[in-house]
Amino acid sequence: MKIIVNFDFIQQELAGKTDVFEVADGTILGDLLRMIDAKIMEAGKNKNIDTTYKTTLAGSQLNGCVVFINGSAPEKMLEHRLHGEDNIEFVYGFCGG
């Protein structure tokens, strides 16, 4: 299924403004965030940019951000099951500390 991700200004220099991720049915948000972080870290490595404060996760918790799915923050954020065409947005002040 396709999940639309809108990156926050903190991430945009590494991930672009928007991307579409293809994930398996039943994927949870935590798994998608790990995929996103891998993309951010690879881009940071290629551009020689520190990604410590640009990733979505710090260990097994959110890295200072709020994640909205279709306009609202789910209660059990990292365990939330995604659905096709979900729209993910990051709100910083927040992601990356």
Where on the chain are the PLM-derived regions?
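Ubiquitin-like/PB1-type beta-grasp interaction modules and other compact soluble beta-rich domains
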Residues: 1-96
